[in-house]
Amino acid sequence: MNMFSKVFGTRSQREVKRIMPLVEKIESLRPDMQKLSDEELRGKTREFKKRLEEGETLDDLLPEAFAVVREAGKRVLGMEHFRVQLIGGIILHQGRIAEMRTGEGKTLVATLPSYLNALEGKGVHVVTVNDYLAKRDAEEMGKIHEFLGLTVGVVLNDMKQDERRAAYNCDVTYVTNNELGFDYLRDNMVIYKEQLVQRDLHYCIIDEVDSILIDEARTPLIISGQSGKSTKLYEACDILAQQLERGEASHEMTKMAAIMGEEVIETGDFVVNEKDKIVNLTEQGVHKVEKFFHIENLADPENLEIQHNITLALRAHNLMHKDQDYVVKDDEILIVDEFTGRIMPGRRYSDGLHQAIEAKEHVKIKRESKTLATITFQNFFNKYDKKGGMTGTAVTEEKEFRDIYAMDVVEIPTNRPVIRVDHEDAVYMTKKEKFNAVVNAVVEAHAKQQPVLVGTITIETSELLSRMLKRQGIKHNVLNAKFHELEAEIVSQAGQAGAVTIATNMAGRGTDIKLDDVARNAGGLMIIGTERHESRRIDNQLRGRSGRQGDPGESRFYISLEDDLMRLFGSERLMKIFTSLGVAENEQIEHKMLSNAIEKAQEKIEFNNFGIRKNLLDYDQVNNEQREIIYKERRQVLDGENMREAIYKMIQDTVDTYVDMCFSDDVDSEEWDLNEFNGVLTPIIPVRPLTAESVKGKKRDEIRHELKEEAVKLYEEKEAEFPEPEQLRELERVVLLKCIDSKWMDHIDDMEILRQGIGLAAYGQRDPVVEYKMSAFDMFNEMITSIQEDTLRMLYHVHVEQKIERDLIFRGEAVAMKGCERCFHTLQQGIIRGAVRDGNRAERGGAGGNSAGSRISEGIVERDGRRGYLGVEPFLHIRGKPAVLTRGKERGKIPEQQGEKKSAAQKQREQDAAVQRSWFHRIGSGADSYHKVCKKC
């Protein structure tokens, strides 16, 4: 603490002092609230809403509203908010982060600002890290809100669309960060407004805010579908990776060293940089790969896939560790959250890494995925009008919260003084010595009935310690990713006298560890950390499990110089010091210099990780700006705006683009390339092809005007084919949405490829982020043009079927399809794809675009007890209207280009291809169907 802080207090202390008059005001209202009956207290909600309508603000209502919630908590739950909890509630309402120690009642604190902000009627989201906590908090804390007349909802992983919508429409909604983000993405993929589940993002309170906004910031939310790519290459690369020999580099290759042409002496077939988690082939390794795959040059563009996959295989074998980064369960690879130790079902590593690990562990390799929609938590939570956060540890990341999220961190004083004793780190030479010391410490504490919580970083370590304790006859519980189902129960019992619990990382976070009287008298909960984490914040979270609400407790970290943190980031001088001191085996060292070295190593990693997250945000900000534009335009279409004028503008723009591209007034019309112009425009807008006669003696603008008139006339003729104009309006909306989605998905992939390669710009002394922005801008404009052209192409070539068939569709009966049964079934396979996301197959097809709530299996869509098939391209079905839309003048046939003569075989091939390109949507009451088989099949 510097001199300024000693005199004036820390910034948090000054903020708390500034808030105290407001707290005094809330407490002064306590006698008035106690006099009110339950009905009168409930009536305050109606009174507050009326006062808001009359012009008062939430800040005006705050003292009285908080006093009402405080009294309701006492009557409903028997829990009255402490003064420090009132302070925390005010901080959250102000859109800041309240750092509150473990056991200070953060869950109860959230009821204060959530009630106040829910009075506006726009919805409040209370965000937690898992379904268990969301459900628990909704059931317990929701009673306060319901008592006061507010509605409370909870969104869980297995809920259906209607249940989610009902929950989001409540005044206060408890939900996990993952469900919240995925629902946002799915809402921006729906075809009809009625399929939306979320309201606008108004105000959220994020519990464990550091876990969500810091730890998970590097992991984007992705909804994906299978890409159809073969998995054979992963198997081949895995075989080769096991044959390659790991070597060493004389020193790390920096960018400057590469630019200056410094030579790095390497041994073996590949080298591993564990700090940056990078694997590079040596020259010797490159030759072996080329020989294995019988290729001449691995660096050739055509061999990029092999190069990428062999790198993935080497990463899987050398940087991804079983029972640390992932577990194998039921012939499946399940990712372990590095910060919580929990399994993350349904999540998969992207870019082929998951498939490489599947090949390594000899489980079934699932096909690679294609990204359909993605967003990072950084950008998602910045969409809220206001957000607040709670955690036990945030001050160490205060700069990041302020720079990226514009949120201040305020330390809230504890209700009772913390009397936990935090011992100096115990440092040993080897891991073996360290683990022996840990077991001895557990045995010693257990002998006096003191409960012990042992925190490990990996599952492997937790199982090793479990075996060692068994040999000592110590009864204990193990809590890691393999046994996470019993998490809450095991953690809640960890404070009982004589209890010994081994937990991976912060498993059990959010569940209080309460001491019994015997345990309290034995010294309280003993925390033993078996390794320092990369982040000081995670270490502080582990320590914070002990000493809640003034309880006794103690903590100590046991470290060896063989730990990853010390090996990769600690100074080599420490090993020399140990050696020079002649430290005996099993001898423990405690020294200020050692503690400082460990802290400096952690600071170095924290700074490095912050840089990575900041860099990710710089790139994702570009994606986010484009995403905002696309989603905004998409929502306008979804909201039912009349698209006729927009379509006409697309027609005008498309004609302008190609006229300007192909014709010039500076060149005589006889020299214009009419074939090129007809080849690019007429497939989009079927105007009459231009000929030398039709353009003779005309200026460019004259031709432009004639083409626009003809294009508009053609579209008006198309509109006249529809019994009702609204049918075409509906079609315009559906087609445009489908084109936007299709092109946006491709654009996401292109942007990722661009980002992966843009780092090379640094070698040319150019800023990669600036280069990325410029390239992304050009790509975005190309995508917009492509959306317009595809939309027009589809709209100009749709055709309304005969009424009898339309009526059958409308009644949901089987429809005769003019197509080949065999071709149709061939198209089915591998086309309808469920989008895999966190824990679930997403309620949206990869290509078919079925609405949320459908279940996708083997190309068949089942919904509301009905059954149907979707085709290779987005289906077009005017909902509630008796119409079937197909492409081409006849189903399965496309118009011939004027003036072309084609053979019968060529015509047949084109007709067959057209059948496969046609959109079809068939809905029937069962599996019965009627198809015709083409001559070819």
Label the predicted regions.
Residues 1-582, 632, 648-649, 653, ...:
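Conserved P-loop NTPase motor core
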Residues 10-21, 898, 905, 909-910, ...:
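Basic, mixed-charge low-complexity alpha-helical segments
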Residues 125, 476, 747, 878, ...:
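Histidine-centered active-site/metal-ligand motif
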Residues 326-334, 340-347, 549-550, 557, ...:
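Extended, charged helical/alpha-beta scaffold domains that provide interaction surfaces
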Residues 823, 934-937:
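Cysteine-centered motifs
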Residues 824, 873-876, 920, 930:
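Intrinsically disordered, low-complexity cationic segments
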Residues 871-874, 913, 932-935:
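Cys/His-enriched microdomains
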Residues 909-927:
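Charged, low-complexity alpha-helical linker segments
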